């Protein structure tokens, strides 16, 4: 299966408490089919103090399942499906709604 969502992509959240928000993918977990998006799905983690770090409540982004995010169309900024096409002998990702190339 080809990677339809990659690190650095602008994505739109389709479901959950952050539905409608947009953000940039900071991490992709392909074995778990999950992605981490900056500023989305922020959770509080209670951490124990160690010799080097102070303990307390830390806010961090939790992962979201890939079915709940869609790549934002480079032209309109709306959610779109991703297709593939060869351009100059290279395989590139293309937004299905506008035909715009996603890979730059």
From Swiss-Prot:
Organism, as annotated: Maricaulis maris (strain MCS10)
Assembly notes: Part of the 50S ribosomal subunit.
A single BP term in Gene Ontology: translation
Function as written in the Swiss-Prot or TrEMBL entry: One of two assembly initiator proteins, it binds directly to the 5'-end of the 23S rRNA, where it nucleates assembly of the 50S subunit. One of the proteins that surrounds the polypeptide exit tunnel on the outside of the subunit.
InterPro entries linked: KOW, Rib_uL2_dom2, Ribosomal_uL24, Ribosomal_uL24_CS, Ribosomal_uL24_KOW, Translation_prot_SH3-like_sf
Keywords, in A-Z order: Ribonucleoprotein, Ribosomal protein, RNA-binding, rRNA-binding
A Pfam family of this chain: ribosomal_L24
Gene3D superfamilies: 2.30.30.30
CC annotations in GO: ribonucleoprotein complex; ribosome
GO MF term set: rRNA binding; structural constituent of ribosome
Family: Belongs to the universal ribosomal protein uL24 family.
Lineage: Bacteria, Pseudomonadati, Pseudomonadota, Alphaproteobacteria, Maricaulales
SUPFAM superfamilies noted in UniProt: Translation proteins SH3-like domain
Protein known as: Large ribosomal subunit protein uL24
């Amino acid at each position: 299966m080809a990677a339809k969502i990659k690190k650095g992509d602008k994505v739109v959240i389709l479901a959950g408490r952050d539905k409608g928000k947009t953000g940039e993918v900071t991490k992709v977990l392909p074995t778990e089919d999950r992605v981490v998006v900056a500023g989305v799905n922020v959770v509080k983690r209670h951490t124990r103090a160690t010799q080097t770090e102070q303990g307390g409540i830390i806010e961090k982004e939790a992962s979201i399942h890939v079915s709940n995010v869609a790549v934002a169309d480079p032209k309109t900024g709306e959610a779109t499906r991703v297709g593939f096409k060869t351009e100059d002998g290279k395989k590139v990702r293309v937004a299905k709604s506008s035909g715009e190339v996603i890979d730059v």
